Amino acid sequence: TEAVIRVEDQAIGWSYVDQNQYCKPLHDLVPLRNQVIKRTVLNTLEPLIGPIRGVNTHSILGYVHKAYPPIYASLCEKAGFTSSLLIRGVEGGVVPSLRQKGLMISYYGGIEKDKVDIDPKLLGIDSELRSISFPKKFENLKDKDLLAKYVIDLGCSALSGDKGMFYDGLVYSASLILWHLRGSQTLPLAAEMVRSALDSGKALV
């Protein structure tokens, strides 16, 4: 209920629901999955649960292997999503390389609508690295809370308009999503909209 209220509040518009709350039996498998280490079919299927649904619900997924997008899109359509955006992201995430060209594929109703080559430079992103690097000081760290705080601080800084690779990653991904949802006719214009929101501080309100 609290999550729904936050989503419906136009001043907030988002919420997070932990898997332990919306599907505890699946969450209880975490210790076993940690022992398996490798990705399982659950990694593919669990994002499709979508505990909060609207009249239109969209799925944003990252992929690595070229054969995956139509499979993911079909699964999303069967799971009731209005559309899906498949982004060839770093390590299978939804943030593309900040250094080189990439690809995104837009599906509506499980049908491919657009297949777009994306270039970070066209969105004003010029980076020597493909993604933010993992700090060496955390490589052997056992206290995950410190790492979590580090990431949260980076995210909050970027959402407050502080420039850097985290900021660029937000601009890039959000621009692709805005374009996919037809909130902007072009990617450069979408990037301007995202930067305006970040730089104004509204994104962190």
Could you tell me what each predicted segment is?
Residues 8-205:
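Glycine-rich anion-binding loops and their surrounding alpha/beta cores
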Residues 1-6:
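Glycine/threonine-rich beta-strand-loop-alpha-helix active-site module
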